[in-house]
């Protein structure tokens, strides 16, 4: 079934300029809808870790992009929260039984789009989770945090207030941003452009990471890009230019996570009781 979906999506992608809400075959519509349903239920993922390597399923990302060409804007929502969009909200039509079955908590006015997967024991404070995102078990998405399209958030992650996790749709990116298990992302931090924050890492408040951000390891003096090694404690910093005339912002790995640092983040358990 998945192979058939992939083949149909790949063929439709090559013909995407000719697709519209009134000009698309039933086969293409069904393939896109099945893919979005799979994302919504967590049966499909844009990226998954296989043998310790993140594998990106580009065809699934293409299905997400194609879905925007197959639908017109429509009024959705209820009460004071009315929207005009092409993608319905994930929780449209949910009653108490559906929320209990999902096993997560959604605090108003949190919004998740259909096609985002929310796992059990996730807490969505007033936040936004975009289509194609995957939020794994036990994660807290705090107030005004944003999980971008197709972003992958691991288990027991805390995305603090105002955190931005970049998406892949606008601007178009090749790979999703990934936050692995047991990470703590400090308030107002931004992680974008397919950067990977490996498991058990802690980002202090106000850390900004893109593919062009220098990541300086204080212990080794080495500079890297695009990936925070597992167990890192990262703070905002700056590095001087070669001639010393100016400095540019960077992220600094100040140490590896120890038991004391992890203990400080366990306060999140109190917020979920």
From Swiss-Prot:
EC numbers: 2.3.1.117
GO molecular-function terms, A-Z: 2,3,4,5-tetrahydropyridine-2,6-dicarboxylate N-succinyltransferase activity; nucleotidyltransferase activity
Keyword match Transferase: yes
Protein origin, superkingdom: Bacteria
This protein's pathway: Amino-acid biosynthesis; L-lysine biosynthesis via DAP pathway; LL-2,6-diaminopimelate from (S)-tetrahydrodipicolinate (succinylase route): step 1/3
Signal sequence range: none
GO biological process, any: diaminopimelate biosynthetic process
Localization: Cytoplasm
Reaction catalysis annotation: (S)-2,3,4,5-tetrahydrodipicolinate + succinyl-CoA + H2O = (S)-2-succinylamino-6-oxoheptanedioate + CoA
Binding site residues for substrate: 105, 142
Top-rank EC class of the record's enzyme: transferase
GO cellular component entries: cytoplasm
Record's keyword annotation contains Hydrolase: no
Chief place where the protein resides: cytoplasm
Pfam families registered for this protein in UniProt: Hexapep_2, THDPS_N_2
PROSITE patterns, per database record: HEXAPEP_TRANSFERASES
Key words of the record: Acyltransferase, Amino-acid biosynthesis, Cytoplasm, Diaminopimelate biosynthesis, Lysine biosynthesis, Repeat, Transferase
Listed PANTHER family: 2,3,4,5-TETRAHYDROPYRIDINE-2,6-DICARBOXYLATE N-SUCCINYLTRANSFERASE (PTHR19136:SF52), MOLYBDENUM COFACTOR GUANYLYLTRANSFERASE (PTHR19136)
NCBIfam families, sorted: dapD, PRK11830.1
UniProt similarity note: Belongs to the transferase hexapeptide repeat family.
Record text on subunit structure and interactions: Homotrimer.
HAMAP family: DapD (MF_00811)
Name of the protein this chain belongs to: 2,3,4,5-tetrahydropyridine-2,6-dicarboxylate N-succinyltransferase
């Amino acid at each position: 079934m998945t192979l058939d979906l992939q083949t149909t999506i790949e063929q439709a992608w090559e013909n995407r300029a000719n697709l519209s809400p009134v000009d698309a075959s039933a086969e293409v519509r069904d393939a896109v809808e099945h893919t979005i349903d799979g994302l919504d239920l967590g049966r499909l993922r844009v990226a998954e870790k296989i043998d310790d390597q993140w594998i990106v399923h580009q065809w699934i990302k293409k299905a997400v992009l194609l879905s925007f060409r197959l639908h017109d804007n429509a009024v959705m929502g209820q009460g004071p929260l009315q929207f005009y969009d092409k993608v319905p909200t994930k929780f449209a039509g949910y009653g108490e039984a559906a929320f209990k079955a999902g096993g997560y908590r959604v605090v108003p006015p949190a919004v998740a789009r259909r096609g985002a997967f929310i796992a059990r024991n996730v807490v969505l404070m007033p936040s936004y989770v975009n289509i194609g995102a995957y939020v794994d078990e036990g994660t807290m998405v705090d107030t005004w945090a944003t999980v971008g399209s197709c972003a992958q958030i691991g288990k027991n992650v805390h995305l603090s207030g105002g955190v931005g996790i970049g998406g892949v749709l606008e601007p178009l990116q090749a790979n999703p941003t990934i936050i692995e298990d047991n990470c703590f992302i400090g308030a107002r931090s931004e992680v974008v452009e397919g950067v990977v924050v490996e498991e058990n890492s802690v980002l202090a408040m106000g850390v900004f990471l893109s593919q062009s951000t220098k990541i300086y390891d204080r212990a080794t003096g080495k500079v890297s890009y695009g990936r925070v090694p597992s167990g890192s404690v990262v703070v905002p910093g700056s590095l001087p230019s070669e001639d010393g005339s100016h400095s540019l912002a960077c992220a600094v790995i100040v140490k590896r996570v120890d038991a004391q640092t992890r203990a400080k983040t366990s306060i999140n358990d109190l917020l979920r009781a």
